[in-house]
C-alpha cells in the first residue's frame, strides 16, 4: 500500500537541515574538515585546494584587520570557527576579545585544544558550541568564513541577516556557493 507524502513546515525543514549539518560535523565531517585544516598530507587534491583557499582567506582577513588598527581595543565574533583557523591567529595578534563558536562540539573541542597548543590562555578566546542563529551579543567585527556552503540559499541568507545584526562596525563573510557538485567533492 502506498504511503502518503509527509508534509513538513518551513520550521521543520530548517530544523532538519540544521540537524543534518550538526550530525555531519560530529562524525564524518569532523574527521574530514579537521584533516583539511591540519598539516596532514592525508588529503585529496580537492581537499588540498580547499585548505589552500581557506588559508588565503584567513590571511587576507587578518591582514585587513591589522590595517584597520587597534586590534586590542576591538571585539570579534568568529561565527563557525571550526578548528580555530581564524580565532587562534587573531588572538596571537592581540585582539581584544574573541568569541568563537561552531555548531559542532567536536570542532569547538579541537579549536580549544589547538589554542592550548599555540599557547593561547583560555581567557583569550571564549569558545562556544552554538548554531549561528542562537549567537547573541554585539561585536565590533563579526566574521563567518566558509560556513554557508553547508546550507541552502534561504537559510544562509537568514543567517547572514542575523550576523549583520550582531556587528557594530563590520561583517566579513566568505563562501563558496552551495552546489551539488561542491557538496559531493568536499
PLM ranges: what are they?
Residues 167-177:
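Conserved beta-strand signature within the Rossmann-like core of class I S-adenosyl-L-methionine
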Residues 77-79, 85-129:
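Class I SAM-dependent methyltransferase SAM/SAH-binding core
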Residues 151-162:
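A short, conserved alpha-helix within the catalytic core of class I
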Residues 51-72:
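Conserved alpha-helix/loop element of class I SAM-dependent methyltransferases that forms part
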Residues 181-186:
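Short, glycine-/aromatic-enriched active-site segment of Class I SAM-dependent methyltransferases
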Residues 143:
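A conserved beta-strand element that flanks and buttresses the S-adenosyl-L-methionine
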Residues 146-147:
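Short catalytic micro-motifs in class I SAM-dependent methyltransferases
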Residues 2-41:
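N-terminal, positively charged/glycine-rich alpha-helical extensions of SAM-dependent methyltransferases
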